[in-house]
Amino acid sequence: MREKRTGELTASVVANAVCAVLFNTSPLWRQYTQGVVLDDFIRVLWAVNLSLLVQMAGSMAMIFYRPPRFAAVAQALGTAAAVLSMIVFYVVFPLDFSAVGAAWVNSVIRVVLIAGMAGGGIGLLVQLGQLTVRWRTFSYTVR
């Protein structure tokens, strides 16, 4: 796993913060979506916020503290939170593109979510495997 640079981590925190503001102000802008974003969007916010907060916390912590084990744990937690967010979004699915005559987009988004959940699940398994190897390799010795 390549070590992330401080600039990349800072950009990640900023991007996640911007997304958090956009998602959490949905009651202000939802009316301009012509019915595409449904009232149920509020029901996915807890999972989206959790994912964004886990990503931001991990990135902020890695700006100052980057031992290999910690980075692996932070990435695995971020992946798990992202997969949870995709699952909740898929189950609730707070979008309806049929309101603008593009009902097929709903199916495409669902397929993309399924692919994302599968990819995230596989990625999480790989990250947990790497974490296990790192835990054994970099185990602390008591002196």
What are these model-predicted stretches?
Residues 33-41, 89-111, 125:
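Interfacial non-cytosolic loop connecting adjacent transmembrane helices
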Residues 1-9, 36-44, 67-80, 104-107, ...:
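Membrane-interface segments at loop-to-transmembrane junctions
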Residues 22-26, 83-95:
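C-terminal TM-helix exit segments that contain a strictly Trp-centered aromatic cap at the helix terminus
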Residues 1-51:
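N-terminal signal-anchor transmembrane alpha-helix
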Residues 41-54, 107-117:
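Alpha-helical transmembrane segments of polytopic membrane proteins
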Residues 55-88:
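Loop-to-transmembrane helix junctions at the membrane interface
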Residues 124-143:
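Cytosolic juxtamembrane helix at the C-terminal end of the final transmembrane segment
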